[in-house]
Amino acid sequence: MMAATAAAQVRAGTRWAPALCRMPWLPLMLVAAAAATSEQQVPLVLWSSDRGLWAPAADTHEGHITSDMQLSTYLDPALELGPRNVLLFLQDKLSIEDFTAYGGVFGNKQDSAFSNLENALDLAPSSLVLPAVDWYAISTLTTYLQEKLGASPLHVDLATLQELKLNASIPALLLIRLPYTASSGLMAPKEVLMGNDEVIGQVLSTLKSEDIPYTAALTAVRPSRVARDVAMVTGGLGRQLLQRTVVPPTMNVPVSYNDSYDTRILFWAQNFSVAYGEHWEDLTSRTFGVQDLNLTGSFWNDTVARLVLTYDSLFGTMVTFKFILANSYYSVSARHWFTLENLEIHSNGSVAYFNASQVTGPSIYSFHCEHVSSENEDGNLLVPDTQPSLWQMTFRDFQIQAFNVTDKKFSYASDCAGFFSPGIWMGLLTSLFMLFIFTYGLHMILSLKTMDRFDDHKGPTITLTQIV
């Protein structure tokens, strides 16, 4: 009997194989179905009785889909620092459009199908709403919570919850299933959502009466509505209808030397790097914004200023940088000009000198340059006295002012950019070429002359005798 059954199965398999070969479109259908499944998104609403668990989501604008990796970055702070009791309200179907269609989005709170949920979000110290979460991330959410909490999910209803004795120090994962229209017969979607909202309200009231801290999440297994095609707007390419918070770039705080009266010297750079031999060190974080920066030896008066920066452990020894500036009056321009005469590096009793006389400007201004470096490819504004030098220095967005500092701010900057830059030369040459063409054409027009003599056909004709 078993042999006959096996033989029948083998014969059936031989019949199915040619049939599958006659359907080459079947793999394409499977791939399309898998792609459609991967594009399904559902909302995720998180709230907790503890505060400060979530920062505002940076990419929850229109079209962004939260992946499983991004979701873990949102959940980890709540699971590691928040309450140990986690509630997961899981519906069969839910879409972000349900909140728009049945929620009190226009101020009509009495007609909202999510009154208890809205009240919980308003009162929660921490909350986070993710409009679109990838279906795969939601499908593995229960397993992820179980691994992070170290507790098996417990399927409960309202009656079971009232009998449970939860402890704030013992982790617990409570799973509450909520129905939707697919399992509610002839009930309208709004009525089902209102019933689910009542269940959420009763569960939260039970926890509140027992004074149990918790973290809750509301999501669904699959979306209730067919999502429109967002393939062209994922990853931040879509129109962002809501204003996004723009994080300003971090700016280094300038180094300031103050005497007993006021701020005298200001020094700033976006990047400050120094090299000894082939080894480079970035001193930006050790220089700007440092409260205990060693400025011992700095000096200032009306004609000479010296800014001294000392680092205790740089390349295994103490290294000191000295910026020496001079302020002089020039009768030709009838104003004072400052010059960074030298930049000195003191280390192990030796001194390396760099000529920086190109760092100059009117003393009422500061000096700014995109690159101030001892390397040739960056302009070579710092020229070492000895070649080759073991020391190399590079400043990016360099700015310094040692005279006429007011209100602890840089004055107007005299930039190192030359007037005859490549772009300016291109514009000048093009303009001169077009001017030459215009001048040549005008000269040709002015040189045109009309004939003042014409052939008179009434006069005697000219006869040419042919000589053979």
From Swiss-Prot:
Site (Cleavage): 228-229
Family: Belongs to the vacuolar ATPase subunit S1 family.
Name this protein carries in UniProt: V-type proton ATPase subunit S1
Post-translational modification: N-glycosylated.
InterPro entries referenced in this protein's UniProt entry, alphabetically: Ac45_acc_su, VAS1/VOA1_TM, VAS1_LD
Topology in the lipid bilayer: Single-pass type I membrane protein
Keyword Ligase (UniProt): no
UniProt GO cellular component terms: clathrin-coated vesicle membrane; endoplasmic reticulum membrane; endoplasmic reticulum-Golgi intermediate compartment membrane; proton-transporting V-type ATPase complex; synaptic vesicle membrane
Source organism of the structure: Bos taurus (Bovine)
Residue span(s) of the pro-peptide: 36-228
Membrane-spanning intervals of the chain: 418-438
Gene3D superfamilies (alphabetical): 2.40.160.110
Leader sequence segment: 1-35
Annotated glycan sites: 167, 258, 271, 294, 301, 348, 355, 404
Subunit (UniProt): Accessory component of the multisubunit proton-transporting vacuolar (V)-ATPase protein pump. Interacts (via N-terminus) with ATP6AP2 (via N-terminus). Interacts with RNASEK. Interacts with TMEM106B (via C-terminus).
Function: Accessory subunit of the proton-transporting vacuolar (V)-ATPase protein pump, which is required for luminal acidification of secretory vesicles. Guides the V-type ATPase into specialized subcellular compartments, such as neuroendocrine regulated secretory vesicles or the ruffled border of the osteoclast, thereby regulating its activity. Involved in membrane trafficking and Ca(2+)-dependent membrane fusion. May play a role in the assembly of the V-type ATPase complex.
Keywords: Cytoplasmic vesicle, Disulfide bond, Endoplasmic reticulum, Glycoprotein, Hydrogen ion transport, Ion transport, Membrane, Signal, Synapse, Transmembrane, Transmembrane helix, Transport
Topology feature Lumenal, residues: 36-417
GO molecular function, one term: ATPase activator activity
Location within or outside the cell: Endoplasmic reticulum membrane; Endoplasmic reticulum-Golgi intermediate compartment membrane; Cytoplasmic vesicle, Secretory vesicle, Synaptic vesicle membrane; Cytoplasmic vesicle, Clathrin-coated vesicle membrane
SS bond partners: 369-416
Parts of the chain on the Cytoplasmic side: 439-468
One Gene Ontology biological process: intracellular iron ion homeostasis
